[in-house]
Amino acid sequence: MKRWILYIIISAVAVVLFFESCAVTSYQRSGQLPVDGLFRPVTNIDTTQNIATISFHDFYNDPLLQQLITEALDSNYNIQLAVNRLAQMSQYLQQSKAAFLPTLDIGLSGSVSDVSKYGNSVRPENPYTELQLIATARWEADIWGKLSSAKRSQQAQYFQQEATVRATQTQIVADIASAYYQLITLDRQRSVTEKNIKSYTDYLQTVEDLKKSAQVTEVAVLQAKSQLAYANAYLPQIDASIAIEENYISLLLGKAPEHISRSSDIDLTRFHSEDLTVGVPAQLLSNRPDVQAAEYALRSAHEQFNVARAAMYPQLTLSGSVGPDAKGLANWFNMPGSLLWNAVAGLTQPILNGRTLKTQKEVAKLQEDAALISFKQSLLNAGNEVSNALASIHFTAQQAKYQIEQVEELKKAFEYSKELLVNGYGTYLDVLSAQNSVLSSELSLYSTYNIIIQQKIILYRALGGGWK
């Protein structure tokens, strides 16, 4: 008999050791992540520092823009929704921690019964009454780490949502800055257009004077009036774009559309320099909130696989109930005679369940693989955004240098053509052509400045800046 008991103990230990070898595994970051060479520099850049580590107050040094960003971080509805979901994740995390504790239920029941007067049973003098107040407890032992894995999975989901909040903040900061500088650009383009309208008006007066002296015909006057109307037509287009940008900023601020105050003395030409500090690609892992969120999603999926695998192992549960059970309330307190209790220890091993547990485990593994793919893709996306922004800044800055030269030469050509016309050596067509070229080239130059500014905003966000 003792030998059989020894065999049972040895077998039980062997089973435990077997399942222990299949127990949960901790998350390890893959060594095959595409980190090196994530972005492609197009010029010599400073990798010893990273603009992503700069707070948005230092990166965007315009006080009015800083005020708008601060207001948006407090009132933007997308950020509020992300924070709300974070609070939900916090509740689920608390629930996962409480799973280690036993459950406790208390039930109160009462019954009254009697028998028929005309049946075979002896009818008691009074109806039979019974009262029960039972407390039932149940506890699952976390011998395979299922509950621990579930808690770690929930922790990862909480941190994932926390990173999502930061990612939302960086996007809102970038959106506010982008729209703000778009407004500044539109203001400059409107100013340029108004200045050119003044020039068109002066030219019209010159042509009318020349017509009086028979140096030009009515055709020249009509052409000058046409070009003045052409220049004036730009203003409503610009005003419409300004209104749209102001409405968009108001939306980001959680407000109804309203006028947006902005600086009028910003020198946009200072933005076309290529003085950039981007750090090293590996820093994207610690700076980019969306990359962090993708890795936390992978951590959660890994722990969910542990949960699904542990569900296939034996489950040890302890349960019990205790409470008074008596015919009447007065008998409740006749303890211990009135007490009803039981205690149960159970070890349950799933055998046949319609492949439910195996399917859950296989699907959980596939979901972990999918999360790893998404994590790798998020890294590539981040590197691609940085590479695109660097390329755009570099080549657009070169373009701006030539456009500055173009504007200066066209202004000279316009002045020379006017002098030639007044002195009888040029034609009004030369003047109109030069005048149109000046207007279009100046508008185009400010659009180029805006592209550089927008790409620097994108680069700052792409490197992970904006949430500190």
Predicted feature locations:
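Terminal intrinsically disordered/low-complexity segments used for targeting and assembly
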Residues: 2-10, 14-74, 239-286, 329, ...
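Small/polar-residue-enriched beta-strand and adjacent coil segments characteristic
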Residues: 63-64, 68-71, 80-83, 90, ...
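Amphipathic alpha-helical coiled-coil segments
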Residues: 82-96, 168, 174-194, 202, ...
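Periplasmic alpha-helical coiled-coil/stalk elements that build and connect Gram-negative outer-membrane
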Residues: 147, 156, 163-280, 392, ...
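Short helix-capping/hinge motifs at transmembrane helix termini and TM-loop junctions
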Residues: 214, 253-255, 314, 424, ...
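Phosphate-coordinating loops and pocket residues in cytosolic domains that bind phosphorylated ligands
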Residues: 223, 286, 433
